[in-house]
């Protein structure tokens, strides 16, 4: 027995010496290198690119001391399958970390020939795999690239949970009409105590209503005493917290021939009119860009370059009125900007709806459009104050003159060419490609956004339609008239009204004095329009 124990101890000692020799040889052959790591499960797993040019997915165990309890890593070869795969030292990573120190060291070497192309390709593959892993974990979130003081990059996403509408459950225990067994026991006890104390008659106690147990925590609409009202309250749908989809609907139904059906009025105010006709929307776009890049506001399928998207929407070549007889050509020598819905001229409340509708307008307006090649004259043009490119100090890439005469109308008169810098053309082309890739091959409501008409031309067409309806006695019309709320001085006495039979509703077609509105416009040097009414 003693001899067998001595032999086993000697065998274990020889094995330990062999492991030490193999470890020292491996350390001298392969120096340690930096890794590209991406967290895939909130600290429980990691995707790592080791020095052996492989991508290793490992899972951290609860007990790090026990080697048998740790999960075996799964290797994904990047370039050479024959390369040995080593698991990282520590698999617990709390953030999505992409280290670029190895790339900087290779590129900073003095001889250019020493920079291996295969090493750069392997690094790019590892970074792409890290991005794919992060997107697989959070497919509906957008990641923001932040550089750390250690020359690393973090992929940060929103960690705050999304709000979800909670539907209150209407049951017998929380309502005041029906009572459960516990309520019956309490009522019996109260009745006995009341009879003992001699309080009130039996008829009064029968007419007394029983209150719910948690009256303070119960919503007001659940404390209704009528049974029918409680059923009606349970059937009422709760308002949604945020609207992710946008759809325009005008007419709901037609009951009989001869009825005029109108959609909701398009209400604008004086501030909306001034901003819609101004070619300089820098302040408005800056306010949008100040909050739009906050993680969690947009989805991963939205356009990343929001600044270039808003440039195309507010002051791009296809963002002006397409009518040959636009009032802006006579007033300023350049057509007015096309009219957009009211939400584009107000502070943004729902960024998801705002961005989806903006991408839809850009997709419809620039369908089949390609930017011309840059000319030397356009290269040397400095541009003005950013004409809607916004962005503050770093928005010079999309700079353009903000005056109304900055655009140049071609001979055909169908579009406006603006002096663009060559740096901005690449960004605009990428945005158009991303928007077309999102909406191409899909059925989208293109008819609401297909019209490129300014506000004054839309009011002129509305006046003509109003008079045509009165003359021809149209049978059924689906139309949403424009109403300017605080410009009563521009409304004429000619107003078409229709009283629907059997109802007290009156549908009005307001007729505006377009000439008075045009005379009240004043343009300053910054491209801002003021309506003096």
Curated annotation (Swiss-Prot):
It is found in: Host nucleus. Belongs to the herpesviridae UL95 family. Residues 9-33 have a biased composition (Basic and acidic residues). Keywords: Early protein, Host nucleus. Residues 50-82 have a biased composition (Low complexity). Disulfide bonds: none annotated. This is Protein UL95. Residues 202-211 have a biased composition (Basic residues). Residues 1-92, 167-216 are annotated as: Disordered. The keyword Oxidoreductase does not apply. It comes from Human cytomegalovirus (strain Merlin) (HHV-5). Participates in the expression of late viral mRNAs. Expressed before viral DNA replication, UL95 assembles at the viral pre-replication complexes (pre-RCs) containing the early viral protein UL44. One of its GO terms (cellular component) is host cell nucleus. InterPro entries: Herpes_UL95. It comes from the Viruses.
């Amino acid at each position: 027995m003693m001899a067998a124990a001595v032999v086993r101890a000697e065998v274990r000692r020889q094995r330990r010496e062999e492991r030490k020799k193999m470890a020292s040889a491996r350390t001298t052959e392969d120096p340690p290198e930096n890794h590209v790591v991406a967290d895939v499960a909130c600290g429980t797993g990691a995707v790592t690119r080791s020095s052996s040019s492989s991508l290793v997915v490992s899972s951290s165990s609860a007990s790090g001391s026990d080697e048998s309890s740790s999960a075996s890593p799964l290797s994904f070869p990047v370039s050479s399958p024959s390369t040995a795969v080593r698991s990282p030292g520590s698999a617990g990573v709390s953030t999505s970390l992409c280290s670029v120190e190895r790339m900087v060291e290779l590129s900073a070497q003095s001889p250019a020939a020493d920079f291996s192309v295969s090493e750069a390709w392997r690094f790019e593959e590892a970074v792409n795999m890290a991005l794919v892993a992060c997107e697989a974990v959070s497919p509906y979130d957008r990641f923001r690239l932040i550089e750390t003081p250690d020359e690393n990059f973090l992929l940060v996403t929103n960690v705050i949970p999304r709000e979800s509408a909670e539907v209150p459950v209407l049951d017998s225990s929380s309502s005041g009409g029906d009572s459960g067994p516990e309520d019956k026991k309490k009522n019996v006890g109260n009745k006995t105590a009341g009879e003992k104390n001699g309080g009130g008659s039996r008829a009064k106690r029968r007419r007394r209503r029983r209150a719910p147990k948690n009256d303070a925590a119960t919503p007001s609409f659940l404390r209704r005493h009528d049974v029918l009202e409680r059923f009606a309250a349970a059937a009422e749908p709760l308002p949604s917290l945020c609207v992710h989809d946008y759809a325009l609907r005008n007419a709901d139904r037609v009951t009989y021939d001869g009825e005029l059906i109108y959609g909701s009025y398009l209400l604008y105010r004086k501030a909306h009119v001034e901003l819609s006709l101004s070619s300089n929307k820098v302040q408005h776009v800056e306010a949008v860009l100040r909050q739009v890049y906050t993680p969690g506001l947009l989805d991963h399928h939205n356009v990343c370059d929001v600044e270039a998207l808003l440039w195309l929407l507010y002051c791009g070549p296809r963002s002006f009125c397409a009518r040959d007889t636009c009032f802006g050509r006579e007033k300023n020598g350049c057509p007015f900007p096309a009219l957009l819905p009211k939400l584009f001229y107000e502070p943004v409340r729902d960024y998801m709806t705002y961005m989806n509708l903006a991408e839809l307008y850009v997709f419809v307006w620039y369908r089949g459009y390609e930017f011309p090649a840059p000319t030397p004259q356009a290269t040397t043009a400095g541009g003005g104050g950013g004409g809607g490119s916004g962005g503050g100090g770093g928005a010079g890439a999309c700079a353009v003159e903000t005056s109304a005469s900055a655009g140049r109308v071609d001979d055909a008169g169908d579009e406006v060419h603006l002096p663009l810098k060559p740096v901005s053309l690449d960004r605009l082309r990428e945005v158009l490609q991303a928007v077309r890739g999102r909406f191409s091959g899909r059925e989208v409501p293109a008819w609401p956004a297909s019209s490129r008409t300014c506000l004054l031309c839309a009011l002129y067409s509305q006046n003509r339609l109003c008079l045509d309806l009165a003359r021809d006695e149209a049978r059924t019309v689906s139309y949403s008239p424009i109403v300017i709320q605080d410009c009563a001085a521009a409304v004429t006495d000619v107003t078409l009204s229709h009283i629907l039979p059997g109802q007290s509703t009156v549908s009005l077609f307001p007729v505006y004095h377009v000439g008075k509105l045009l005379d009240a416009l004043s343009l300053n040097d910054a491209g801002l329009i003021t309506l003096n009414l």
